[in-house]
Amino acid sequence: MSRYTTIPYLEKINFVERYRALCHKFNNYDTCLDSYEAETYKEVLDEFGLLYEYDKREKFFRSVYALTSGHEFILTLGTLKGRVELFIEIGYEGRYMIPSGRLDTIPEEMGYEFDRKKYNLPKFSSVEDLREILYTLMGIIKDLEQAIVEGAGAET
């Protein structure tokens, strides 16, 4: 197994099914808010203790941090109207691990069937929906971090 692939870690945390379930639950484009809700993003990111920068002009949040295993995580949350767009990049030893990028593209890069028209991006109809989406996504990210740290420890 290549040390520059995220696939075993994503499979370990059941990423594809978790992301599909999230998109299925929050999939009503007709009722999604015509709002960015940047303050809610800030509150949730603060609750998870992430340092981040907000690009008001481009409307995205970015957080860059390192794990104890030496992996660097770059999370970018696009604040689209009524939709949550998360990009993830993971660096290790000066290289980016694959697959990476926008979460809805990762299942196909892993070799799984994933209907992006049906399960594109989670959509929120209320601030409560947005909070639940962000908490679910951060739970996935935290589980991925843990799987990577545990996997890196097993390599030594």
Residue ranges and their predicted role:
Residues 46-59:
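Short secondary-structure junctions
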Residues 74-77:
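Heme-based O2/NO sensor domains and their adjacent alpha-helical segments
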